[in-house]
Swiss-Prot record:
It comes from Candida albicans. One of its GO terms (biological process) is filamentous growth. Residues 2-76, 106-183 form the REM-1 domain. This is Protein kinase C-like 1. Residues 327-340, 730-741 have a biased composition (Low complexity). Residues 189-311 form the C2 domain. Residues 747-763 have a biased composition (Basic residues). Residues 304-359, 548-594, 615-646, 724-763 are annotated as: Disordered. The keyword Phosphoprotein applies. InterPro entries: AGC-kinase_C (IPR000961), C1-like_sf (IPR046349), C2_dom (IPR000008), C2_domain_sf (IPR035892), C2_fungal_PKC (IPR037778), HR1_rho-bd (IPR011072), HR1_rpt_sf (IPR036274), Kinase-like_dom_sf (IPR011009). Pfam families: C1_1 (PF00130), C2 (PF00168), HR1 (PF02185), Pkinase (PF00069), Pkinase_C (PF00433).
Length: 1097
C-alpha cells in the first residue's frame, strides 16, 4: 500500500468528475438501504440501515461542499495571473478549522474533512504498531518453543493472534477512509491536521470515571440463531487492561467504572465478541487522556462564562462599529475621571471554599463516540487530574510563583548540543530509524533526534557550527539529495527531527533518488549522504579510524621518545561566564567610541581571569618582592584600583553612563603586613580557606569627589589575592590609562581641587548590621524579609537566597544579572522601579538589601477591593513607563504580575523582583528560556519558541485584564490547563465593557508576536499612542504630578499590615543550612557585594 504519491495530480475538472461519481454512488447506497428497510421487520437491521443512510447523507454533504469550493476556485483560476494568485491565497485561507482530536472521534464530528485526514494518518500509525507487535510475538513464540517453554510460547502465540485480528480491523477501517478521501492537495491544505502543542503529550495522573450506556451499528460476529452472542467492552490504559464490562446480549450496559491512572497517556475502548470461548475484537477506538482533560476544561470555561454575557471581541457590538457601550461611563474607555465599578462576574466569590467549588465545577463529557471500522458507543467520561504541586489556578485571583526551566545537561558531539528530552508520542531515531519512545537526545540547535545509545555514533557536524569549529570525521561521500514536494498519504517520520510528517503536500519533501522524507524546513539540515544511511556512514568511519593512527597519537609517541624541556605554566581557557560575556559584547560595543573599544579589547587579551589565576602555579618571588606583595588595606585603598570580577557588569557600566559614582565594597582576603612570608604564600595558593563570608573585613570606601568620579574597572576582584608582581604593576598602569581615557571621553568634568590623599570613612557591611522584623513574601527562588538597620534605624526589605540552591540550579549568572538590573534601575532613580541599597553575602546565602515599600502589593489590594476603571488605568500607566525604561536599557522583565507591583505610601507603584530579567534584549533580539508565571506567559514562550521583548506587552495585557475585571483571561486547574488555554483559547470580554478598553486588550493579547501592540521599533510608544490612553499626559505620570486615586493606610513606619498574613505570620528567621560549599562553588559569588551611592542604611 502506497503511503505517498508523486506531486503530479489530477486537474480540477477530473477531481470534480470524481466527486460527482462519489455523490452518485452514495445516493444509490441510500436507495438500496431504503429498499432493504422496507422489506424487514428486524429492529436491529432497521436501526443499522438508518445509521448507514445518515452516514451516506453526511458524505454527500461533504462531497457537495468540496465540489462547490473547487468550482469557485476554478472560476477564479480562469482570471488573469495576478488575480489568480490573490484568489488562491484567499481560497486557502478562507477556512481555518480549530478542532481538537477528541472532536474528530465523535460520531457527530463538526468537520468530516478533518476527521478523514486525521483517521487516515492515525489508523496507518496504529497499523504499523500492530504489525510490529505481531512480528515480535511471532519471534518470541519461536524462541520459547526452541527452549521447550510451551506455556510461554502459547502466550506469545495468543498475543500474535490478537494482533492479527486487530490488523484486520485496522485495514478495513483504513480502506473505508481511503475511499472517502479526495486526492487533491489543495484540500489537504484546508483540512490539515493541527500540530499538537508541547503540553498535549504529557503523561497524566488522576481518576478516570467511565460509564458505558450502549453501543450500536457494530458488525458483530455471526452466530447461530439459537445461540445469543456475548459482548463486552474492554478498557485499556496504555495497552494494559484496567476494566471490562459484564457480558451483554443486547449491547446495553449500565455500568460505571472508576480507574486510577498513574502517568498514563492513551485510553483504548475495545468491543469484543465471544467466539469459541475466546473474546475477539470487533470494534475499537482510542483517545488521549490529555484530549479528554482539554475537553473537560473547555466545558468548564464555557460554563463559567456562558451565562454571564461574555463574548469574543469579534462578537461584541461595540467592537463591530457601533462604538457605544452599555453604560455611559464606560463608553469613553476608562478615563481618569471614570470611577464606576466594572461589570460584575459570577466567578468572583471570595467566600467559596476550594472543595465546594470543585464539586460545583465537576464536569463530565457525554457523547456518541465513533468505533472503527464501524459503529458508535454512547459513553459518559470524567477525569479528575491530580494536582501534584498543589497549585490551584481556578477561582479568584491568587498568588502563583514563577517557574524557570532548569538548565539541561549538554552532551556535545561534532558541534551538536544534545540534551535529553521527553516525548509522549512515537518518534523516529534519525540515525538508526527505529522507534523512539518517551526519551531521546535532541540537538538544541538543529533539532537532530536520536537514541541515547546512538548520539555517540553521529558522524555529521551540527549545521549551526562553522566547518572549522569542530574536527568531525569526514567522508568523501558528498552526494546531495534531490528533495521535491510530495503528497503524503500515510504515516512517515522526518529523517532529521524524528517527528511524524503531516498529511498532504504543504510541508513534506522526498528525495527522488534515495526516497528519504523530511519536513520542508529540515531539508537544509539533512547531510549530503544520498544513497547512504547515517548508520552505514558511522560503520565506515569506525572502520577507517580503527585502521589508522591519529596525528595526536603519533605526537604522543614522539613526545615519549624524546624528553622535552620544561614548559611554562599553561593558562586554562576562560570560564563560561567570561565567554558568554565576550560573546555578547559586540552589541554593546556599538555604544562606545572606537578608541575606548580598542583599549578594552587589548586589556582583555592581557589580563588573566580569576579562573586562570585559580589554576596557575604559584610564582616564586625574591624576598624583596614578597615584602612588596603584602598589601595593607590603607595603601591599597589609594594606590591601586579595586577590580570587579563581574566583567559583564563592568562592561555594561562602561557602555552606559560611566559618570555614575559608585561605592565599592571590597570582597578580597584580609592580609596582615606582619604575618610570616610562608603563611602569606600559603594563603595566596588557597584563598578560600579563610574566605571572608561574613564580610568581617569588608570595607565600604566612600571616595572623595574626585575619586568617586572614577569609573570602576570592568575586571574587579579578578586578581585579588594574587601576588603583585612587576607584571601585575604594569597591568595596573594599563588599567589606570584606560580609566583616564574613559574619564576624558565619557565622564563629566568636575572642578575639584581636593587632594587624592584625603582620608576615607569606612564601615562594615554584613548580616549583623540588620535586625529582621517580619516576612514580607516568599517565592520559588527565595524569601523577602523586613529588616531594620542597626546603625541608622532605617527600614529595608532584604531578599535572601541560598547559595546551594543557586549552585544546584546553575543560577549564579542569573543572580549577577539581577544585581546589574538593580544598578540599572538605580542609575536614574526611576520613580516606578524598586531601588537597591546594597548587597552582600555570607557563607551560605546572598542578600539584596532593597528599599522598603510599605503599601503592600497590588495582589493584596485587589483581593480586598475591586479596582475602579480609573485606578486600574492609573496603575497601568505607571507600569507602562517602568517597562519602557527597562526596554530602553535593553532589559526584558518577563515576570510582570500583581504580586510584583508594590504600592508606595503616596499611592504610586514600584515594580520589584528582577530575578527573571534578561539583559541585552534590544529590538529584534530574541531568547528562548522557558520562564515566567504561567498565567502571564506569552504563547511563544509556552510553545518553546524564540521570543523577543514583546512578551512583556502580552503580560501587560494580562495584568490590565486582571485589574479591570478581577480575573484572569485564561483559566484552568493547573499549569498545563493554563498553557493550553493561552495557546488555543480566544479571550472573551463582558458585553458592556467599553470599546477602547476591549481594543487595547485585544491588541495586547494578540497571539502572533509580530502583530502585537508594542512589538515594533517604537516599543512602548505604540501603546502610549493607543486611543485608550488618549487622555493621559505621560510626562505628568512620570513626574508623579497626577494625584493617586488610592492612598494605602499605613499606621506607622513599622506597619506591615498591607502584606499578606500568610507571610507576615511566619517567624522572621533564617533556617539552618547544612550544605557545605566548596571553594569552586564560592568562586561563583566573587564580587557580589556592593553598596549603592544613595544607600540610606
Amino acid at each position: 500500500m502506497s503511503t505517498s504519491q508523486p506531486s503530479q495530480q489530477q486537474n480540477p475538472e477530473q477531481v470534480v468528475n470524481d466527486i460527482r461519481q462519489k455523490i452518485e454512488k452514495e445516493r444509490k447506497i441510500i436507495q438500496g438501504f431504503n429498499d432493504v428497510k422496507r422489506n424487514t421487520n428486524n429492529p436491529e437491521v432497521i436501526q443499522k440501515w438508518k445509521s448507514k443512510i445518515i452516514e451516506s447523507q453526511s458524505m454527500i454533504d461533504y462531497y457537495q461542499e468540496t465540489m462547490n469550493k473547487l468550482t469557485r476556485q476554478m472560476q477564479r483560476l480562469n482570471t488573469n495571473s495576478s488575480s489568480r494568485t490573490a484568489s488562491r491565497s484567499s481560497v486557502i485561507s478562507e477556512y481555518k478549522p480549530s478542532y481538537s482530536n477528541f472532536d474528530l472521534i465523535k460520531y457527530e464530528c463538526p468537520s468530516l474533512g478533518n476527521k478523514i485526514q486525521f483517521m487516515l494518518q492515525y489508523l496507518e500509525f496504529k497499523l504499523q504498531v500492530e504489525n510490529k507487535y505481531s512480528e515480535a510475538n511471532k519471534k518470541l513464540s519461536h524462541l520459547y518453543l526452541m527452549d521447550g517453554d510451551k506455556s510461554s510460547s502459547n502466550a506469545a502465540e495468543g498475543g500474535r493472534a490478537e494482533s492479527d485480528q486487530r490488523i484486520q480491523l485496522l485495514e478495513k477501517a483504513l480502506k473505508k477512509y481511503q475511499k472517502f478521501s479526495i486526492n487533491d492537495h489543495e484540500f489537504d491544505r484546508d483540512y490539515e491536521i493541527m500540530d499538537s502543542t508541547k503540553h498535549s503529550r504529557k503523561l497524566l495522573t488522576g481518576r478516570l470515571t467511565v460509564s458505558i450506556t450502549c453501543i450500536r451499528d457494530v458488525d458483530h460476529i455471526a452466530t447461530a440463531l439459537a445461540k445469543k452472542r456475548e459482548t463486552v467492552v474492554v478498557i485499556k490504559v496504555d495497552d494494559l487492561e484496567k476494566a471490562r464490562t459484564k457480558p451483554s446480549k443486547n449491547d446495553n450496559w449500565n455500568e460505571e467504572m472508576v480507574i486510577d491512572v498513574d502517568k498514563s497517556h492513551e485510553i483504548e475502548l475495545a468491543v469484543m465478541d465471544k467466539q469459541n470461548g475466546i473474546y475477539v475484537p470487533v470494534a475499537v477506538n482510542w483517545f488521549s487522556l490529555f484530549d479528554l482533560a482539554e475537553e473537560i476544561r473547555k466545558k468548564k470555561v464555557a460554563k463559567d462564562q456562558g451565562s454571564s454575557g461574555w463574548l469574543p471581541a469579534a462578537n461584541l457590538p461595540q467592537t463591530g462599529g457601533s462604538g457605544a457601550g452599555t453604560g455611559s461611563s464606560m463608553t469613553g474607555g476608562a478615563s481618569y475621571g471614570a470611577t464606576s465599578p466594572l461589570p460584575a462576574h459570577n466567578d468572583l466569590r471570595p467566600s467559596v471554599s476550594p472543595s465546594s467549588d470543585a464539586k460545583e465545577n465537576k464536569v463530565s463529557v457525554s457523547t456518541w463516540l465513533s468505533l472503527e471500522p464501524g459503529g458508535q458507543m454512547l459513553i459518559n467520561l470524567n477525569f479528575e487530574k491530580s494536582i501534584t504541586n498543589g497549585k490551584q489556578f481556578r477561582g479568584p485571583l491568587g498568588r502563583h510563583g514563577a517557574i524557570r526551566q532548569k538548565k539541561e545537561e549538554v552532551f556535545e558531539k561534532h558541534g551538536h548540543q544534545f540534551v535529553q528530552k521527553q516525548f509522549y508520542n512515537i518518534m523516529s531515531c534519525a540515525l538508526c530509524g527505529e522507534f523512539l519512545r518517551y526519551t531521546g537526545y535532541q540537538c538544541q540547535d538543529c533539532k537532530f533526534l536520536c537514541h541515547k545509545k546512538c548520539y555517540q555514533k553521529v558522524v555529521t557536524k551540527c549545521i549551526s557550527k562553522s566547518g572549522s569549529d569542530y574536527d568531525a570525521a569526514q567522508l568523501n561521500h558528498r552526494i546531495p539529495h534531490r528533495f521535491e514536494p510530495i503528497t503524503n498519504h500515510g504515516t512517515k517520520w522526518c529523517c532529521h527531527c524524528g517527528y511524524i510528517l503531516p498529511w498532504g503536500k504543504k510541508n513534506v519533501r522526498k528525495c527522488t533518488e534515495c526516497g528519504v522524507m523530511c519536513h520542508a524546513q529540515c531539508t537544509h539540515l539533512v547531510p549530503d549522504f544520498c544513497g547512504m544511511s547515517l548508520q552505514m556512514a558511522n560503520e565506515i568511519l569506525a572502520t577507517i579510524e580503527s585502521t589508522k593512527v591519529s596525528p595526536k597519537k603519533a605526537q604522543h609517541q614522539q613526545s615519549h621518545a624524546k624528553p622535552l624541556p620544561p614548559k611554562p605554566p599553561i593558562e586554562s581557557k576562560p570560564s563560561m561566564d567570561s565567554e558568554e560575556t565576550l560573546h555578547n559584547e559586540p552589541s554593546y560595543k556599538s555604544l562606545r567610541p572606537a578608541s575606548v573599544v580598542h583599549q578594552d579589547t587589548n586589556f582583555v587579551s592581557k589580563l588573566p581571569t580569576t579562573v586562570q589565576n585559580k589554576y596557575q602555579e604559584p610564582v616564586e618571588l625574591p624576598p624583596q618582592q614578597q615584602n612588596q606583595v603584602v598589601p595593607s588595606t590603607r595603601r591599597r585603598g589609594h594606590g591601586s584600583t579595586d577590580l570587579s570580577f563581574e566583567t559583564g557588569y563592568g562592561q555594561q557600566q562602561h557602555q552606559h553612563h560611566r559618570d555614575v559614582p559608585q561605592i565599592v565594597v571590597e570582597d578580597h582576603q584580609h592580609y596582615n603586613s606582619n604575618d610570616n612570608r610562608d603563611v602569606e604564600m600559603e594563603e595566596s595558593k588557597d584563598e578560600f580557606d579563610n574566605f571572608d563570608y561574613n564580610n568581617k573585613y569588608t570595607e565600604n570606601e566612600i571616595l572623595t569627589d574626585v575619586q568617586q568620579d572614577q569609573v570602576r574597572s570592568p575586571f574587579a576582584d579578578q586578581i585579588q589575592g594574587v601576588p603583585e608582581t612587576s607584571h601585575a604593576k604594569q597591568q595596573n598602569q594599563q588599567v589606570q590609562q584606560v580609566q583616564q581615557q574613559e574619564e576624558l571621553g565619557h565622564q563629566r568634568t568636575h572642578s575639584s581641587g581636593k587632594s587624592g590623599k584625603s582620608k576615607r570613612r569606612k564601615r562594615k557591611v554584613g548580616l549583623d548590621d540588620f535586625q529582621f522584623l517580619a516576612v514580607l513574601g516568599k517565592g520559588n527562588f527565595g524569601k523577602v524579609m523586613l529588616a531594620e538597620s542597626r546603625h541608622t534605624s532605617k527600614l529595608c526589605a532584604i531578599k535572601v537566597l541560598k547559595k546551594d540552591f543557586i549552585v544546584e540550579n546553575d543560577e549564579a549568572e542569573s543572580v549577577k544579572s539581577e544585581k546589574r538590573v538593580f544598578l540599572t534601575a538605580n542609575k536614574e532613580m526611576h520613580p516606578f522601579l524598586l531601588n537597591l541599597h546594597c548587597c552582600f553575602q555570607t557563607e551560605n546565602r546572598i542578600y539584596f538589601v532593597m528599599e522598603y515599600i510599605s503599601g503592600g502589593d497590588l495582589m493584596w489590594h485587589i483581593q480586598k477591593n475591586r479596582f475602579t476603571a480609573k485606578r486600574a488605568k492609573f496603575y497601568a500607566c505607571e507600569v507602562l513607563l517602568g517597562l519602557k525604561y527597562f526596554h530602553d536599557n535593553g532589559i526584558v522583565y518577563r515576570d510582570l504580575k500583581l504580586d510584583n507591583i508594590l504600592l508606595t505610601t503616596k499611592g504610586h507603584i514600584k515594580i520589584g523582583d528582577y530575578g527573571l530579567c534578561k539583559e541585552d534584549m534590544w529590538h529584534k533580539s530574541t531568547t528562548s528560556t522557558f520562564c515566567g508565571t504561567p498565567e502571564f506567559m506569552a504563547p511563544e514562550i509556552v510553545a518553546g519558541k524564540a521570543y523577543d521583548r514583546s512578551v512583556d506587552w502580552w503580560a501587560f495585557g494580562v495584568l490590565l485584564f486582571q485589574m479591570l475585571l478581577c480575573q484572569s483571561p485564561f483559566k484552568g486547574d493547573d499549569e498545563d490547563d493554563i498553557f493550553n488555554a493561552i495557546e488555543n483559547d480566544e479571550v472573551k470580554y463582558p458585553i458592556n465593557l467599553s470599546r477602547q478598553t476591549v481594543l487595547v486588550l485585544q491588541a495586547l493579547l494578540t497571539k502572533d508576536p509580530s502583530q502585537r501592540l508594542g512589538s515594533g521599533p517604537k516599543d512602548a510608544e505604540e501603546i502610549m499612542e493607543h486611543p485608550y490612553f488618549h487622555d493621559v499626559n505621560f510626562d505628568d505620570v512620570l513626574n508623579c504630578r497626577i494625584p493617586a486615586p488610592y492612598i494605602p493606610e499605613v499606621q506607622s513606619e513599622h506597619d506591615y499590615s498591607n502584606f499578606d498574613k500568610e507571610f507576615t505570620s511566619e517567624t522572621p528567621r533564617l533556617t539552618p543550612v547544612e550544605t557545605v560549599l566548596t571553594s569552586e562553588m564560592q568562586e561563583q559569588f566573587r564580587g557580589f557585594s556592593h553598596i549603592s551611592d544613595n544607600a540610606t542604611i
